[in-house]
Swiss-Prot record:
It holds the Pfam family GTP_EFTU. It is found in: Mitochondrion. One of its GO terms (cellular component) is mitochondrion. The keyword Thylakoid does not apply. The gene is MEF1. GO terms for biological process: mitochondrial translational elongation. This is Elongation factor G, mitochondrial. It comes from Chaetomium globosum (strain ATCC 6205 / CBS 148.51 / DSM 1962 / NBRC 6347 / NRRL 1970). Its main location: mitochondrion. InterPro entries: EFG_II, EFG_III, EFG_III/V, EFG_IV, EFG_V, EFG_V-like, EFTu-like_2, G_TR_CS. Residues 1-24 form a transit peptide. Residues 97-383 form the tr-type G domain. Mitochondrial GTPase that catalyzes the GTP-dependent ribosomal translocation step during translation elongation. During this step, the ribosome changes from the pre-translocational (PRE) to the post-translocational (POST) state as the newly formed A-site-bound peptidyl-tRNA and P-site-bound deacylated tRNA move to the P and E sites, respectively. Catalyzes the coordinated movement of the two tRNA molecules, the mRNA and conformational changes in the ribosome. The keyword Disulfide bond does not apply.
Length: 798
């Protein structure tokens, strides 16, 4: 206590004779005040004045340094999980246990947004239901963008919050949901990616007719990437051809995650009226306007009793494979109670070993409420999930974040959005409390920012709040940052890993039709790039054209349309361009001498070595030096590496990126006055370009995993279409429709939607997802290279 008193006293007094002492004391007091109860510190400050005056400053400096060390140790002790748990009030523990951060994700048109609308209605968040393509023209609440309502698709993920009152054994508990509705189209996959990065659980929606589809597999991959537990909801049970058990089989076989139904349907297709709960063996139906009332009966329809017993046994057997407690009971031939089954499902789901499958029809207002109960029962609260940060003071050692309000603040900015009131930054609070007016530090650049306003989002509406606790999701105004930035209150040297951002696969040139729109065009482009990491822009040095890149035709079309609507900028766009890559297939040696004299100091550099395929990583490049004897000094070798990187940005064949190349420098020569970093950088670039043709330089084209769904009667027409475009990988034929999966060159898919509409009378649909790069056919490569050389010649002749 005496050293803290010393520090406090010195901080209060005018310690002019020892600036070092004052500095230590100030730090000690600040640390003590932020990590200890305030009263003892104030007491120490008053008492310490009796011990120290200006004449004691040198002694105080030593005492203050000891005080700083002690205060830091005290602060560290207060930040341990045990100390934080001890300070947690029963109210905070209760609040945390009732929070569910969930997302709704699925294939296109599986009913994600319709499910979200029912969740909002049944939780009382909205007073009326508006359909995605409803006749009232209002559109779904979660599709707030005009383009979304016109096209009937979700383009941006939308966040909201709601309270769900769950009744169990006559006791009502209120759960708090933070809900994010995500797009289904692959072009907007970054929206799903960043949602999964910050969510604790998800509802994976499947179509009862189609089951697991192409985008379902993509969503599954994203959930696994971020270790997100999920429950599965088989939607559209009232459709003709619905088969929930086929969907369960497909989850097991295609997604490779153990799954079992926890419900079976009462009635099928148009006769679907509810579900049988296999855990409690009871029937659940919906009554009243929009299915607002849930009617539970302990009497199961007679014709379903045998099926219910069979599916319940299958559920227990599947749980025995993934849960030790149920496995032990199964071996002892004991029947688990409903409580034991629910506990096992929760353990296995949170442990990423299992997904329970529920079923219903959101559009028909049936069996959505039991799915909400399942979210409460089986998906984790923020305290059940291991969210990790990287401690930058310990070489980015992983450290677990704890969702306690009393700990230092750590949050992740996962989405940026332009708003009439300024930039809106969505933040997931992992640890600590975020308060209005609080100062935070951006871990990426150590910039200090103030939080002037905190809101909770309800699609495009907002509600102001003064503070947000640990485990919650909110949005803030007035914070300049990038998507994926970590924020702390300055007491912890933590950063967090960002989300995965896929490479763009398509580009096109764009320019405003009117020169007067240049400022608005530039403003829009900066905003779009800030909001969407998959939307990129660059200016081609040779053509001086502005090139935008994205995930597909629809992705870029949407941004061109938003330019017109939101910024009143009409644009001219060029033909879509494929993002080709260049590579090499064999080893080639080089010995290149750069020797230029222009009156003054010249350029001299010689580099010797070879280039070869990068066998370690076909998607990346590698530079290596094996120079002996100091023929090239180290300072120039670094310039050689930089030159190789720059040469790979724009390949010799088409001007596209080079991948899969390994360059080795073994020897070289320098000149006393004419050698420089610039000379060796340029010599390396020229050596690489000269050796590229000898190394079997080739063009790689992107292959797309293409999924086509259409009525079975058009199967022959689509086979003819796809035989011209790519190799067919798989075909699934159902009662009324079929699905074809093929690998196609992106170049061959331009305008495919028009051909598909003609071949299927407008009844077919398709989606594309980048698969991998593969060598382009020789005739295409020859054509592309000739076209590129012709363009270069035309530019040189201008």
């Amino acid at each position: 206590m005496r050293v803290i008193r010393a520090a406090a006293a010195l901080n209060s007094s005018c310690a002019a004779s020892s600036r070092q002492g004052a500095r230590y004391a100030s730090l000690a007091c600040r640390t003590a005040l932020t990590s200890s109860p305030l009263a003892p510190c104030y007491s120490a400050r008053l008492s310490g004045l009796r011990y120290f005056t200006k004449t004691h400053a040198p002694r105080a400096a030593s005492a203050a340094e000891a005080a700083l060390k002690q205060a830091k140790e005290l602060a560290a002790a207060n930040m341990t999980p045990e100390a934080a748990a001890a300070r947690m009030t029963p109210e905070e523990a209760k609040r945390l246990s009732m929070v569910r951060n969930i997302g709704i994700a699925a294939h296109i048109d599986s009913g994600k947004t319709t499910v979200s609308e029912r969740i909002l209605f049944y939780t009382g968040r909205t007073k009326a239901i508006h359909e995605v393509r409803g006749r009232d023209g209002v559109g779904a609440k979660m599709d707030s963008m005009e383009l979304e309502r016109e096209r009937g698709i979700t383009i941006q993920s939308a966040a909201t919050f709601a309270d769900w009152k769950k009744v169990e054994n006559g006791v009502e508990e209120t759960y708090h949901f933070n809900l994010i509705d995500t797009p289904g189209h692959i072009d907007f996959t970054i929206e799903v990616e960043r949602a999964m990065r910050v969510l604790d659980g998800a509802v994976m929606v499947l179509c009862a007719v189609s089951g697991v589809q192409s985008q379902t597999i993509t969503v599954d991959r994203q959930m696994k990437r971020y270790n997100v537990p999920r429950i599965s909801f088989v939607n559209k049970m009232d459709r003709m051809g619905s088969n929930p058990f086929k969907a369960v089989e497909m989850i097991n076989s295609k997604l490779k995650i153990p799954a079992a139904a926890v419900q079976i349907p009462i009635g099928s297709e148009k006769e679907f009226e509810g579900v049988v709960d296999l855990i409690h063996m009871r029937a659940i139906r919906n009554d009243g306007l929009r299915g607002i009332n849930v009617r539970v009966s302990n009497t199961i329809p007679e014709n379903l009793k045998e099926l219910a017993e069979q599916k319940r046994q299958e559920l227990i057997e599947k749980l025995a494979d993934v849960d030790d407690e149920i496995a032990e009971m199964f071996l002892e031939e004991k029947t688990p109670t409903p409580e034991q089954i629910k506990a096992a499902i929760r353990r296995a789901t949170i442990g990423l070993k299992f997904t329970p499958v529920l079923m219903g029809s959101a559009l028909a207002d049936k069996s959505v409420q039991p799915m909400l109960d399942a979210v409460c029962d089986y998906l984790p609260n923020p305290g059940n999930v291991d969210n990790m940060a990287l401690d930058r003071s310990k070489k980015e050692e992983p450290v677990k974040l704890l969702p306690y309000d009393s700990l230092p603040f750590v949050g992740l900015a996962f989405k940026l959005e332009e708003n009439p009131y300024g930039q809106l930054t969505y933040i997931r609070v992992y640890q600590g409390t975020l308060k209005k007016g609080q100062y935070l530090f951006n871990a990426r650049n150590d910039k200090k920012v103030r939080i002037p306003r905190i809101v909770r989002m309800h699609s495009n509406e907002m509600e102001d709040v003064n503070e947000i606790g640990a485990g919650e999701i909110c949005a803030v105004f007035g914070v300049e940052c990038a998507s994926g930035d970590t924020f702390t209150d300055g007491r912890l040297p933590y950063g967090m890993s960002s989300m995965f951002v896929p490479d763009s696969v398509m580009s096109l040139s764009i320019k405003p039709k009117r020169s007067s729109d240049a400022d608005a065009f530039s403003k829009a482009m900066n905003r779009f790039m800030r909001e969407d990491p998959t939307f990129r822009l660059h200016v081609d040095e040779e053509s001086e054209e502005t090139i935008i890149s994205g995930m597909g035709e629809l992705h870029l079309d949407i941004y061109v349309e938003r330019l017109r609507r939101e910024y009143k900028v009409d644009c001219e766009t060029g033909k879509p361009r494929v993002a080709y890559r260049e590579t090499i297939s064999k080893r080639a040696e080089y010995d290149f001498l750069l020797k230029r004299q222009s009156g003054g100091p010249g350029d001299y550099a010689r580099v010797v070595g070879w280039i070869e395929p990068n066998v370690e990583n076909a998607e990346g490049n590698k530079f290596e030096t094996k120079v002996v004897g100091g023929n090239i000094p180290d300072k120039y070798l670094a310039a050689c590496g930089k030159g190789f990187e720059e040469a790979c940005i724009k390949g010799p064949l088409l001007g596209h990126k080079v991948i899969g190349a390994h360059m080795v420098v073994t020897d070289g020569a320098t000149h006393v006055t004419d050698s420089s970093d610039y000379a060796f950088n340029l010599a390396t670039q020229m050596a690489f370009r000269k050796a590229f043709p000898d190394a079997g330089g080739a063009v790689l084209e992107p292959l797309m995993k293409t999924t086509i769904t259409a009525p079975a009667e058009f199967q022959g027409n689509i086979l003819m279409l796809m035989n011209k475009r790519g190799s067919i990988v798989d075909t699934e034929v159902g009662a009324d429709e079929f699905t074809m999966i093929a690998e196609c060159s992106l170049n061959a898919m331009f305008g495919f939607s028009t051909h598909l509409r003609a071949a299927t009378q407008g009844k077919g649909e398709f989606s594309m997802e980048f698969s991998h790069y593969a060598p382009a056919p020789p005739h295409l490569q020859k054509e592309l290279v000739a076209q590129y050389e012709k363009e270069l010649e035309a530019k040189r002749s201008k």
